[in-house]
């Protein structure tokens, strides 16, 4: 049973290499299938992807016309391996934490009724390219964030929830997680550090006004769904919604 990690990327050749290295480091923990979705990159990202795929049989790549991260995530879902049983995501500028799969996968393997595990992330301003961890002395904070990389999901859950909402160009992950936690989905909240989330000027979420707009839209959609269907109730982990000033 394969674990597919969907990695959408657009014009991030250098950080993509670090992200993939962090995944390859964990390939002995699961039968890993790394699916890189190139969202129409215009720089050397496509060349880097080809080199990575040539070097690592775990890597598959699909290229699409540029359409934004939401459509790229859906392209990933459309291209799951026939043997995929578990799914998670990793953004191209983040890195997977060591032992992320070794820690949480046994929970899903031992409890077939659990649809996903949900852990923590560390937000930071700088990743060490050697250790693939936050640089010593860099601003960092462990939080339970609203982030897809914190979730390790059964494919059956993905099938039930469906595709990402392509009307959202941001906060599509918030919307997707809310759609999961609005239903009676059995999950285990863990203390596992799942990934290191890089905050930087080039990050899409740096546009706070736009980010707040789409976050509010995702929350409103959740409220509307629950109002229309009283059986939908929010059963969610305890999310941390605020970052310290040095990480904003």
Model-based region annotation:
Residues 2-4, 33, 175:
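Cell-envelope/extracellular polymer assembly enzymes that use nucleotide-activated donors
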Residues 21-31:
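Short, acidic, metal-binding catalytic loop of nucleotide-sugar glycosyltransferases
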Residues 22, 38-47, 66-67, 91:
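A conserved acidic beta->alpha catalytic loop
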Residues 44, 94-107:
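Acidic donor-binding/catalytic loop of UDP-sugar-dependent glycosyltransferases
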Residues 56, 69-71, 77-78, 101-157, ...:
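Flexible acidic/His/Gly-enriched loops in nucleotide-sugar-dependent glycosyltransferase catalytic domains
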Residues 83-95:
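Short beta-strand-to-loop acidic/aromatic patch adjacent to the donor-nucleotide binding site
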Residues 120, 187-194:
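Catalytic beta-strand/loop signature of glycosyltransferases that borders the donor
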Residues 170-176:
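Acidic donor-binding loop at a coil-to-helix junction in glycosyltransferase catalytic cores
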């Amino acid at each position: 049973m394969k674990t597919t990690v969907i990695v959408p990327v657009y014009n991030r050749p250098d950080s993509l290499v670090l992200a993939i290295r962090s995944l390859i480091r964990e390939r002995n923990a699961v039968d890993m299938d790394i699916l890189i979705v190139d969202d129409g990159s215009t720089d050397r990202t496509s060349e880097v992807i080809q080199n990575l795929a040539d070097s690592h049989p775990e890597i598959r790549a699909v290229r699409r016309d540029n359409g934004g991260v939401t459509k790229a995530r859906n392209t990933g879902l459309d291209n799951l391996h026939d043997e995929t049983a578990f799914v998670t995501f990793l953004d191209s500028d983040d890195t997977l934490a060591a032992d992320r799969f070794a820690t949480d996968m046994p929970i899903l393997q031992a409890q077939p009724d659990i649809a996903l595990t949900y852990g923590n992330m560390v937000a930071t301003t700088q990743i060490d390219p050697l250790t693939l961890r936050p640089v010593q002395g860099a601003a960092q904070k462990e939080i339970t964030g609203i982030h897809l990389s914190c979730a390790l999901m059964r494919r059956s859950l993905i099938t039930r929830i469906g595709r990402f909402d392509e009307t959202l160009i941001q906060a599509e992950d918030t919307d997707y997680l809310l759609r999961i936690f609005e239903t009676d989905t059995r999950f285990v909240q863990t203390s596992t550090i799942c990934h290191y989330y890089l905050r930087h000027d080039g990050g899409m979420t740096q546009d706070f006004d736009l980010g707040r707009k789409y976050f509010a839209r995702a929350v409103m959609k959740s409220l509307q769904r629950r109002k229309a269907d009283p059986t939908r109730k929010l059963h969610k982990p305890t999310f941390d919604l605020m970052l310290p000033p040095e990480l904003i």
